[in-house]
UniProtKB/Swiss-Prot annotation:
This is GTPase Era. Disulfide bonds: none annotated. The lineage of its organism: Bacteria, Pseudomonadati, Pseudomonadota, Gammaproteobacteria, Enterobacterales. Residues 7-175 form the Era-type G domain. Residues 41-45 are annotated as: G2. An essential GTPase that binds both GDP and GTP, with rapid nucleotide exchange. Plays a role in 16S rRNA processing and 30S ribosomal subunit biogenesis and possibly also in cell cycle regulation and energy metabolism. Residues 62-65 are annotated as: G3.
Length: 301
């Protein structure tokens, strides 16, 4: 009697902030797990997205963008989390943006050169490159930087060539038993996903300055007798002025954030959600490593 083989492995998605790593992860999984926003530094935790297709299970680690500035404690922890997830994977997808190449890209590349895992280079946002004639020389320049397993021009936004990436990933998964049941999409708890959804809405509806000094704690997440969930979210900001900004004129801003977050939660949890949000000032949290650890920003996952 033959036993069917199964394949399973970890894949890190790395790159400087804002190149489209989370969008790529969401496309590879076919649904939204990692929060996406046009602001850099959106992903703060190493989200694991799981894609199981028949015998193949790919487990994706979505790293925060590696970046040069290490000034604040939160940035230091984010960089550590990104570096540590490069270490213990079967494959790395290095995402870069169109024909742009920055010192941050260079820094990520240097970390990858030291690693043992093969690297797929995903050149994202190629559909946005104005001068198509610049693309080929740039791809040749990239190819000379290190011995990549493959170089794939993609658009994570439209899905262009994302299936090519998925096929390369499948080909390089080692023979192993699956770590997760086949219907799992992420190993993060619903409570964690709820906080991520609220954070995404904060980033979407607030000005450029605010989001990095904002975090969300879920104080209550319980099932109710109506077959849904009662969720209380606490939004922590660093200053009184930011609190006013989050609440908005006569509470209009926080109301919008709550409505939009509730919609996404209901879709994700497939159940009715009663959501209440509060805003509280907790000064200096982004600079205090102890406070960060208590909020779940851990660097030794």
């Amino acid at each position: 009697m033959s036993i069917d083989k199964s394949y399973c492995g970890f894949i890190a998605i790395v790159g400087r902030p804002n190149v489209g790593k989370s969008t790529l992860l969401n496309k590879l999984l076919g649904q939204k797990i990692s929060i996406t926003s046009r602001k850099a530094q959106t992903t703060r935790h190493r989200i694991v997205g799981i894609h199981t297709e028949g015998a193949y299970q790919a487990i994706y680690v979505d790293t925060p963008g590696l970046h040069m500035e290490e000034k604040r404690a939160i940035n230091r922890l984010m960089n550590k989390a990104a570096s540590s997830s490069i270490g213990d994977v079967e494959l790395v997808i290095f995402v870069v943006e169109g024909t742009r190449w920055t010192p941050d890209d260079e820094m990520v590349l240097n970390k990858l050169r030291d690693g043992k895992a093969p690297v797929i280079l995903a050149v994202n946002k190629v559909d946005n490159v104005q001068e198509k004639a610049d693309l080929l020389p740039h791809l040749q320049f990239l190819a000379s930087q290190m011995n990549f397993l493959d170089i794939v021009p993609i658009s994570a936004e439209t899905g262009l060539n994302v299936d090519t990436i998925a096929a390369i990933v499948r080909k390089h998964l080692p023979e192993a038993t699956h770590h997760f049941p086949e219907d799992y999409i992420t190993d993060r708890s619903q409570r964690f996903m709820a906080s991520e959804i609220i954070r995404e809405k904060l980033m979407r509806f607030l000005g450029a300055e605010l989001p990095y000094s904002v975090t969300v704690e879920i104080e209550r997440f319980v099932s109710n007798e109506r077959g849904g969930y009662d969720i209380n979210g606490l939004i922590l900001v660093e200053r009184e002025g930011q609190k006013k900004m989050v609440i908005g004129n006569k509470g209009a801003k926080i109301k919008t954030i709550g409505i939009e977050a509730r919609k996404d939660m209901q879709e994700m949890f497939e159940a009715p959600v009663h959501l209440e949000l509060w805003v509280k000032v907790k000064s200096g949290w982004a600079d205090d490593e102890r406070a960060l650890r208590s909020l779940g920003y851990v660097d030794d996952l």
